[in-house]
Every structure is written in C-alpha cells, then in structure tokens.
Amino acid sequence: MSSETPSPVRPERRPKAETEGRGASALRLRSGRTDVSVRGKITPNAPLAPLVWFKSGGSAEWLFEPRDEDDLTSFFKGLDPDVPVMALGLGSNMIVRDGGVPGVVVRLGKAFAKIEKLDDVTLRCGGGASGILVSSTARDAGIAGLEFLRGIPGTVGGFVRMNGGAYGREVQDILVEARVALRSGTVETWPLEKLGYTYRHSDVPEGAVVIEAVFRGSPGDPEAIGAEMDAIARAREESQPLRSRTGGSTFKNPPGHKAWALIDAAGCRGLKLGDAQVSEKHCNFLLNLGSATSGNIEALGEEVRRRVHDTTNISLEWEIQRVGLDR
C-alpha cells in the first residue's frame, strides 16, 4: 500500500491476502462510515511470531503501521469502537497466543521514534523510540537519571503504559507527561498523576496507544552517564539469557520477595515443557529452545506458578503480557 496516497479500507471488500490461511474478518467500521483511509500499511493475517522475542504465536487479524499521528487517529475515528486494538512495540515482554490476536494490532514505526531535547534536562520522546535510544540520547545531552532505560528492552509506548523499571528506578521517577491516542481517535495529554502508576501498572485504558512522552532527568556528565549505562549492560549480559528466545522478566516481584528466588526455591530452575524451559541462568526468564508453541510457554509459566504457590503459598503474578486466543 502506498505510503503517500490514502487508501480506503472497506468492510465489504476482502483483501486478496484474506483468502490465504484462516482469513481475517472484514474490518468493521464505525456506524455511518463506508471506508477509512490510511496512509500507512495495513495487513490482514499478519504473522506476529517474527515480531516478538519468543518467536512463537499466531497472526494479527489486522496489523496497522500508521504513517504518522494523524494517520493513527483518523483510523481510530473510522474504526468500529467494538473492534479490539492492541499496541505492539519491540515484542519483548509478550506472549502471543497460538490462535492469534483478533482485531487490530498497532505497531509504531520510525515516525514515532523521534526524540527532541526540550531543555537541559528534558526530552520529548516518540512512543516508538527504544529504551536504548532514549538513554543514549540523554547521555549525549548530559541528562542523568535515564540510564536505567538502557536495561528495559522495549519502547516508550510500552514502558510508559506499564511503568517499566530496572535497577531500582521506574518510569514514574522521570515522567512529566504522556500523550495518549484514545480509541475514539482523540489525543489527550496526561500529566504524571493521571496515569495512576503502581508497580508495573498504569491507568492507560485498553485500546489506547501512548504516542509520546516527556521525561525529565538532572544535569550530568556524559562520561559518567555512559559508564553507568555500560555497567547496566554488563550486568544484564552476566545475569540474563539475552541471546535466547525469551520474553524478559516473566513474573512480578511479590512484596518483600524476588520472583526468581521463589522460583528457584520451588525447584523450577531448568524445568522444561516441550521446547519451553525455565532459564538456568535467570529463572524468572522463560525460553523457547527452538520449536516451543506459545501454549507450551504459557503452560510452563502456569506450572511454575503452581509449584511456587504449593511451596510458599505465594501467588506469582504475570508480568509478561499474554494476548490473543488459544488455538
């Protein structure tokens, strides 16, 4: 689809690709609309496994990669409000179930990855910018306090939504405000207080997409900032299975406990189910050893939860987002 000329998506017409595989449903539009024009790329039956770290799971009924903010909001305004919408970043903290994801998956591209320095300690960052890019930009600008983002394998949109954190800091420590594209097609600017942050949670509604965030740090020396970022990178390399098909941290830390320690004490280090395995290097990470299905991975996680509860009476809560339908 051309990125220059708007192309109508009509509910009564099925793209040719829909005849292959299971087929996507016709895209449902808002009452009174006969089509919705997009300038980005919209793909039916889009495989999601290549886009997520586990390399498993089904397809998106529709994958929409908007050209820019106006393209995204125009699409939302034309879409039936009952059609589910989900944002996808780097796919690092997600299990896509084997039956695929109904509705629309929105993936923000380069147009949403821009970063602008507002003043000596403040950056405006697009929702598609990675944690590595944000922290590196802050380092080069002499802005301290954002180093921990080097340890979050995701995008601004994702870690703002979930109050992502690493190495003792969280997004709520640096966020000034976020711009959120709501399912209605309107865009709102939310100050920090409105996000209602708690541990790995925010009040961003389902179907909304975080398209921009403003972060504030403090004056710092680029060399010292870089040294801290390097230390974070080394610590991750030494303690986490980074070069594997993994989804990152699997379970939230219960109050007063480390999830990995509970998992280890329950005898789950190295536990396998099919080609899914609890990492021996860091047992709060699950691995796809090659041919694991998302069903294998999720079932292994549930077995870990069962064993931890049986031995400690503590219920681990999933940190990884699990989306879509079982096959």
Say what each PLM segment does.
Residues 49, 67-70, 110, 129, ...:
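Conserved active-site and cofactor/substrate-binding residues in soluble primary-metabolism enzymes
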Residues 55, 107, 124-126, 147, ...:
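Conserved beta-strand segments that form the floor/walls of ligand-binding pockets within enzyme
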Residues 33-156, 166:
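Anion-binding (especially nucleotide phosphate/pyrophosphate-binding) glycine-rich loop
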Residues 1-37:
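Intrinsic disorder/low-complexity segments
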Residues 94, 135-138, 146-150, 163-170, ...:
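A generic local secondary-structure boundary/capping motif
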Residues 81, 88-90, 174, 244-245, ...:
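Short, basic and Ser/Thr-rich N-terminal targeting/leader segments
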Residues 43-44, 94, 181-327:
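Phosphate/pyrophosphate- and phosphate-bearing ligand-binding catalytic cores of soluble enzymes
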Residues 64-69, 95-113, 160-191, 205-212:
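Structural signature of FAD isoalloxazine-binding scaffolds in flavoprotein oxidoreductases
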